[in-house]
Amino acid sequence: MEHSAWHELIKAQLPEHYFGKINQFLDHVYAGGTIYPPREKVFAAIQTTDLEEVKVVILGQDPYHGPGQAQGLSFSVPNSVPAPPSLQNILKELTDDIGVKQDHDLTAWAEQGVLLLNACLTVPAGQANGHAGQIWEPFTDAVIKVVNSLDQPVVYILWGAYARKKKALITNPKHLVIESAHPSPLSAYRGFFGSKPFSQANAYLTSQGRTGIDWLR
């Protein structure tokens, strides 16, 4: 990340030496137990999607906490792993909205400019939200603010109450915010299914002169 366009802009949004605190936190937690995703994938979202290429932001809460699932991109798992329930529902809504995507791995979205960002970038094995409130929120809020400052139009897809709180950080009138219930089985039938976020995002991007996302890749 140090050599990317992200680095200095994120750094400018944070207290002095915050990157050092993050590295100390990572050294500590990875030395003390099983943490997901693998350490080399903690920053995968901003390593895979260049700042200049961001077209869509899909905000998650924290990584999957089961073995082999988390890969540093919100909602994504390797194709070798069964899709968790929220991802199953995302793919079901995608099928109803645009068409069938076979992959559970969403890397192809990230490579097209979909920033798949979790608010917390690490999680202890088996402990959902186990690192919430410890180190990550100022960092990921800074990422959202950096994207908010871009001149080109971006679509933010905010699923569920936690993600929707971040709407306060999105102040640039060039951007579009799409909100709905979370794709979790607990809430998917309360406004997620039928929300058509993927076609909505592409319609806005193309209306603003940007190429849409091939969501079926």
From Swiss-Prot:
Any idea which UniProt keywords this protein has?
A: Cytoplasm, DNA damage, DNA repair, Hydrolase
- Compartments it resides in: Cytoplasm
Cross-referenced Pfam families:
UDG (PF03167)
In which domain of life is the source organism classified? Bacteria
Q: Give a yes or no for keyword NADP in this entry.
A: no
Q: Name one GO biological process term.
A: base-excision repair, AP site formation via deaminated base removal
| Keyword presence, Cell division | no
Query: What residues sit in the active site?
Result: 62 (proton acceptor)
**An annotated GO cellular component:** cytoplasm
Report the SUPFAM superfamilies cross-referenced here: Uracil-DNA glycosylase-like (SSF52141)
Could you tell me which NCBIfam families the record lists for this protein?
Answer: PRK05254.1-1, PRK05254.1-2, PRK05254.1-4, PRK05254.1-5, ung
Biological role: Excises uracil residues from the DNA which can arise as a result of misincorporation of dUMP residues by DNA polymerase or due to deamination of cytosine.
- Designated name of the protein: Uracil-DNA glycosylase
Please state the gene responsible for encoding this protein: ung
